[in-house]
Amino acid sequence: MLKDPKQVHAPNFGVVVSVRGSVVDIRFDESLPPIHRLLRVVGIFIVIEVLAQRDARVVRGIALTPTQGLARGMRVEDSGGPLTAPVGKAIISRMFDVFGNTIDNGPLLNNVQWRSVHRAPPTLSQRSTQSEIFVTGIKVIDVLVPLERGGKAGLFGGAGVGKTVLLTEMIHNMVSHHNGISIFCGIGERSREGEELYREMKEAGVLPNMVMIFGQMNEPPGARFRVGHAALTMAEYFRDDESRDVLLLIDNIFRFIQAGSEISGLMGQMPSRLGYQPTMGSELSSLEERIANTEDGAITSIQAVYVPADDFTDPAAVHTFSHLSASIVLSRQRASEGLYPSIDPLQSSSKMATAGIIGERHYNLAQEVRRTLAKYDDLKDIIAMLGLEQLNVDDRKLVGRARRLERFFTQPFFSTEQFSTMEGKLVSLDDALDGCERILADEFADYPESALYMIGAVDEVKINNKAAQHTKQQKEKNNGSTDVN
């Protein structure tokens, strides 16, 4: 919602002198509005944010709403303040747009404060560093790419490899076990996905500890560019004012960069490499640096990052990598093989994967798993050309272990139960480590690889095998009885 600040300000009106798409030039004869000031067109709901002062009388702004109906000569009013976001306990379990308007058909907001979305990150003296693992219940992440409580993790992948599904599953697993507040920020994604997520969270009963805010792909670039700042303003309130831990989920950070690129082009800035805005680094930093820990609380952020054409050297991906404590890379090759979640264990990394933080046993197991998978990756070309039989005995055993590990790291998700008909599984870190240890010890060498596919804890292999044998015996017994008759 658009709110005037509490202080009284003299009315200040301007006139539209130029409209080019979402970019609007406005002349003010009396007082020139400062950068980030919000302007409103008189008589029509169009909101403009000032991004530049062209000269002593004209400002250039970007529209945060569609500009249909806007024309030269229209009067524009200075709102007297910047874009604001609602904060307070009343925003919990609600869904908002970039202006702080509720979009869930619920009652009007009461007892909320309105704070500017343009806030400075915590100073170095205010920051706090912690080394604590954030368990997700997803085997491959908890074992090989452990997340940091109060850290930033990125889910990198091209189109259709499972970023949103993985993010939704992490929401399901973590929101129900997370003691703090969870905030979901949808930037430039499909409206359908936002509606589905809201319904799923409501049915799962986790909305009482959740806030959702959306700037979807049908909205102007200005709205998509600012919705991340609005979400962070809400997160900072719970961290600083209520001393609570916050889980901030962003889908998709690339769309934030893309919106900035659109704005940069509309503003007439010279593009840099691959057409991105020259200010991409500073714009991304202004968002990412606000995601920080203080003595009062922590903001843990998990961000989906679309990678254009699967090119991980793309400037958007490279700039995002540098801000993260954990990078989870999704592989199209693994997705095509049906190995879901399609996380590439060799490309993914985490700064938490050190013996001093996760312990000697976990660290040594993770390293042994990586070595096994890396060696198998090296042998794939030989296997493709000459066949598995041409390998020596030790290499054949290693390949068997690696393939069983790959299948053990698959996992049925709660968020896909309605599509896959497989019941979702939440696996503890101890069960995941125990499974890796036993597979590396060749305990399941006599079991088919498929027995480890889409299971939870590794003990399910033996349980399922016994059930399969019992079913087979029953069928044989029934067939025998039929033959006698």
UniProtKB/Swiss-Prot annotation:
<dbReference type="InterPro" id="IPR020003">
    <property type="entry name" value="ATPase_a/bsu_AS"/>
</dbReference>
<feature type="binding site">
    <location>
        <begin position="157"/>
        <end position="164"/>
    </location>
    <ligand>
        <name>ATP</name>
    </ligand>
</feature>
<keyword id="KW-0139">CF(1)</keyword>
<dbReference type="GO" id="GO:0005524">
    <property type="term" value="F:ATP binding"/>
</dbReference>
<comment type="similarity">
    <text>Belongs to the ATPase alpha/beta chains family.</text>
</comment>
<dbReference type="InterPro" id="IPR004100">
    <property type="entry name" value="ATPase_F1/V1/A1_a/bsu_N"/>
</dbReference>
<dbReference type="Pfam" id="PF02874">
    <property type="entry name" value="ATP-synt_ab_N"/>
</dbReference>
<dbReference type="Pfam" id="PF22919">
    <property type="entry name" value="ATP-synt_VA_C"/>
</dbReference>
<dbReference type="InterPro" id="IPR017691">
    <property type="entry name" value="Alt_ATPase_F1_bsu"/>
</dbReference>
<dbReference type="InterPro" id="IPR000194">
    <property type="entry name" value="ATPase_F1/V1/A1_a/bsu_nucl-bd"/>
</dbReference>
<keyword id="KW-0547">Nucleotide-binding</keyword>
<dbReference type="GO" id="GO:0016887">
    <property type="term" value="F:ATP hydrolysis activity"/>
</dbReference>
<dbReference type="InterPro" id="IPR005722">
    <property type="entry name" value="ATP_synth_F1_bsu"/>
</dbReference>
<keyword id="KW-0472">Membrane</keyword>
<keyword id="KW-0375">Hydrogen ion transport</keyword>
<keyword id="KW-0406">Ion transport</keyword>
<keyword id="KW-0067">ATP-binding</keyword>
<dbReference type="InterPro" id="IPR003593">
    <property type="entry name" value="AAA+_ATPase"/>
</dbReference>
<dbReference type="GO" id="GO:0005886">
    <property type="term" value="C:plasma membrane"/>
</dbReference>
<keyword id="KW-0813">Transport</keyword>
<dbReference type="InterPro" id="IPR036121">
    <property type="entry name" value="ATPase_F1/V1/A1_a/bsu_N_sf"/>
</dbReference>
<comment type="function">
    <text>Produces ATP from ADP in the presence of a proton gradient across the membrane. The catalytic sites are hosted primarily by the beta subunits.</text>
</comment>
<keyword id="KW-0066">ATP synthesis</keyword>
<comment type="subunit">
    <text>F-type ATPases have 2 components, CF(1) - the catalytic core - and CF(0) - the membrane proton channel. CF(1) has five subunits: alpha(3), beta(3), gamma(1), delta(1), epsilon(1). CF(0) has three main subunits: a(1), b(2) and c(9-12). The alpha and beta chains form an alternating ring which encloses part of the gamma chain. CF(1) is attached to CF(0) by a central stalk formed by the gamma and epsilon chains, while a peripheral stalk is formed by the delta and b chains.</text>
</comment>
<dbReference type="GO" id="GO:0046933">
    <property type="term" value="F:proton-transporting ATP synthase activity, rotational mechanism"/>
</dbReference>
<dbReference type="InterPro" id="IPR002885">
    <property type="entry name" value="Pentatricopeptide_rpt"/>
</dbReference>
<dbReference type="GO" id="GO:0046961">
    <property type="term" value="F:proton-transporting ATPase activity, rotational mechanism"/>
</dbReference>
<protein>
    <recommendedName>
        <fullName>ATP synthase subunit beta 1</fullName>
        <ecNumber>7.1.2.2</ecNumber>
    </recommendedName>
</protein>
<keyword id="KW-1278">Translocase</keyword>
<keyword id="KW-1003">Cell membrane</keyword>
<dbReference type="InterPro" id="IPR055190">
    <property type="entry name" value="ATP-synt_VA_C"/>
</dbReference>
<dbReference type="InterPro" id="IPR027417">
    <property type="entry name" value="P-loop_NTPase"/>
</dbReference>
<keyword id="KW-0997">Cell inner membrane</keyword>
<dbReference type="InterPro" id="IPR050053">
    <property type="entry name" value="ATPase_alpha/beta_chains"/>
</dbReference>
<dbReference type="InterPro" id="IPR024034">
    <property type="entry name" value="ATPase_F1/V1_b/a_C"/>
</dbReference>
<dbReference type="GO" id="GO:0045259">
    <property type="term" value="C:proton-transporting ATP synthase complex"/>
</dbReference>
<dbReference type="Pfam" id="PF00006">
    <property type="entry name" value="ATP-synt_ab"/>
</dbReference>
